[in-house]
C-alpha cells in the first residue's frame, strides 16, 4: 500500500512455505484489502485480519468459510468459541486517528457473528493491538498508535470468563507504543516502538 498515493500497489496475499522443498505457494490474494495485519490458526481453521475484514478459512482447502466486516481490525486471539479483535485506524485524508466506541470486540468463531464488546467506558480507551490469552485472561496492548505524538504504554487485562476489564498495567515513559506481546514462563514481554525514534522491551510478572 502506497500511503502517499493512498492506493494499493500490490495486494496482500496468504501463502505457505515448505522448508524442505523451499517452495512458497500463494494460496489467496486479498484484493479488497490494503494490508493484512494478523493470522492465527485454531483447530481446522485459519483466521486472518486484513484491513477492515476478518476472514475464516478451512485449513485443509484454504477456501473461505465466511467473512465479517470490522472497521479498524488489527489483531486476533481465540478463547474457546470466541475470537477477540483489537482495533485502531487513521483517516486516509486527515491522517488523524479514527475514534471508535470500542477498541476491543468479540465474535463467535463459528460464523464470525458479533458477540459483545468492551466500550471506552468499560474497556480500553485508546487503540489496541496485539493480544495473548493465558489462564482465561486476555492481555492486550493499548498504544494509541494512530495519534502520533500521543502514544500510550498500557497492557490491559480482561477476565474472559466474565468478559470484564479487570486491570491495566502502565509500562512507564519508556514503554510507549507497545506493538507485540510474548509470554515465557510466568513473564509477559512487550516490544515497544516508543515514538518511532527507538524501541524498548518491558517485562511483566504474571
Tell what function each PLM region has:
Residues 1-55, 87-88:
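Acidic/polar, low-complexity intrinsically disordered N-terminal segments immediately downstream
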Residues 5-10, 49, 91-102, 146-153, ...:
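Short, solvent-exposed loop/turn segments at conserved positions within beta-propeller repeat blades
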Residues 12-15, 53-55, 102-105, 153-156, ...:
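A short loop-to-beta-strand structural motif that recurs across blades of beta-propeller domains
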Residues 18-22, 58-62, 108-112, 159-163, ...:
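Short loop/turn segments that connect beta-strands within beta-propeller blades
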Residues 22-32, 61-69, 113-121, 164-171:
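A short beta-strand motif characteristic of beta-propeller blades
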Residues 33-43, 71-81, 123-134, 173-185:
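Repeated scaffold domains used in trafficking and secretory/extracellular systems
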Residues 65-105, 109-132:
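Asp-box/WD-like beta-propeller blade repeats and closely related beta-sheet repeat scaffolds
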Amino acid at each position: 500500500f502506497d500511503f502517499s498515493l493512498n492506493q494499493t500497489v500490490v495486494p496482500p496475499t496468504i501463502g505457505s512455505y515448505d522448508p524442505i522443498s523451499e517452495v512458497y505457494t500463494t494460496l489467496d490474494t486479498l484484493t479488497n484489502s490494503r494490508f493484512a495485519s494478523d493470522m492465527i490458526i485454531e483447530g481446522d481453521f485459519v483466521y486472518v485480519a486484513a484491513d477492515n475484514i476478518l476472514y475464516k478459512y478451512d485449513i485443509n482447502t484454504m477456501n473461505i468459510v465466511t467473512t465479517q466486516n470490522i472497521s479498524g481490525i488489527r489483531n486476533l486471539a481465540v478463547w474457546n468459541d470466541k475470537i477477540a479483535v483489537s482495533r485502531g485506524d487513521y483517516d486516509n485524508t486527515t491522517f488523524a486517528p479514527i475514534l471508535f466506541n470500542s477498541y476491543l470486540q468479540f465474535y463467535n468463531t463459528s460464523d464470525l457473528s458479533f458477540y459483545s464488546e468492551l466500550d471506552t467506558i468499560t474497556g480500553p480507551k485508546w487503540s489496541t493491538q496485539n493480544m495473548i490469552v493465558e489462564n482465561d485472561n486476555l492481555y492486550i496492548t493499548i498504544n494509541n498508535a494512530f495519534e502520533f505524538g500521543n502514544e500510550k504504554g498500557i497492557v490491559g487485562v480482561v477476565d474472559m470468563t466474565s468478559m470484564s476489564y479487570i486491570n491495566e498495567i502502565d509500562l512507564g515513559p519508556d514503554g510507549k507504543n507497545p506493538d507485540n506481546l510474548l509470554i515465557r514462563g510466568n513473564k509477559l514481554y512487550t516490544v515497544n516502538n516508543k515514538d518511532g525514534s527507538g524501541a524498548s522491551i518491558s517485562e511483566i510478572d504474571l
